[in-house]
């Protein structure tokens, strides 16, 4: 069982103090391992430094956003995840469903996440829609469902441990699961990189 505890109000606890508290929890048998979330390269390396020098528990994963519209994890953290064996648990791999293309041209599907939670405006700003349309077109040109291409891309990254999918219907779940069987061609990956070069991380 994997549980992540989120406390947006607590951001000032020193890293060493956090690790010492986690050591006590681990020694009591309440947890086996722990992971980080929304951490920076510097913060991740400080956790690993204290774990090594103070003989404290070591982070085994990092849960950060990663998708075709937000690949900022690749800037520093991807190398750490790979070389230090702190694998990425990628959340929001579909960018709140935006990479399905269902919000293009101002569409607001009933009960869809960005329809219900209008405060998440990052997927409607700047070059976001241009990037989404480009990825949707690329997928369709290659006979793929845009959702499945987006998920398959995330799953193909060497620094990934788990792709955290989300679904509100059985149809969505089935579509998502099919992506685990896809292997993207070199030509398709080159197409993705071309779009990324034009619209680099429009939704960080």
What does each of the following model-derived ranges do?
Residues 19-23, 41-48, 78, 132, ...:
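Generic structural signal for well-ordered alpha-helices
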Residues 40, 66-70, 92-99, 153, ...:
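Glycine-rich beta-alpha junction loops
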Residues 26, 115, 121-181:
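Conserved short secondary-structure transition element at the edge of the structured enzyme core
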Residues 26-27, 72-87:
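Basic phosphate/pyrophosphate-binding loop/patch that engages nucleotide-derived ligands
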Residues 1-63:
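Glycine/proline-rich, positively charged
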Residues 51-55, 78-80, 105-109, 180-182:
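Short, hinge-like loop/turn segments at secondary-structure boundaries
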Residues 1-4, 80-138, 204:
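Glycine-rich, positively charged active-site loop/lid region within alpha/beta enzyme cores that binds
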Residues 34, 62, 81, 88-91, ...:
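Conserved, mostly hydrophobic/aromatic
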């Amino acid at each position: 069982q994997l549980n992540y505890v989120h406390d947006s109000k607590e951001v000032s606890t020193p890293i060493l103090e956090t690790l010492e508290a986690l050591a006590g929890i681990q020694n009591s048998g309440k947890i086996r391992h722990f992971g980080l979330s929304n951490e920076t390269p510097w913060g991740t390396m400080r956790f690993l430094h204290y774990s090594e020098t103070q003989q404290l528990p070591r982070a085994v994963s990092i849960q950060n956003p990663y998708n075709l519209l937000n690949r900022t994890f690749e800037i520093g953290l991807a190398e750490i995840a790979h070389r230090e064996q702190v694998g990425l648990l990628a959340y929001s791999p579909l960018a709140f469903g935006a990479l399905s293309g269902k919000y293009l041209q101002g569409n607001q599907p009933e009960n869809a996440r960005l329809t219900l939670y209008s405060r998440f405006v990052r997927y409607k700003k700047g070059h976001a829609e241009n990037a989404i349309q480009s990825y949707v077109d690329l997928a369709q040109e290659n006979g793929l469902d845009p959702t499945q291409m987006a998920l398959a891309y995330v799953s193909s990254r060497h620094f990934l441990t788990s792709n955290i999918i989300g679904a509100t219907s059985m149809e969505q779940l089935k579509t998502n699961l099919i992506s685990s069987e896809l292997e993207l061609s070199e030509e398709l990956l080159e197409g993705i990189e071309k779009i990324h070069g034009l619209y680099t991380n429009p939704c960080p």
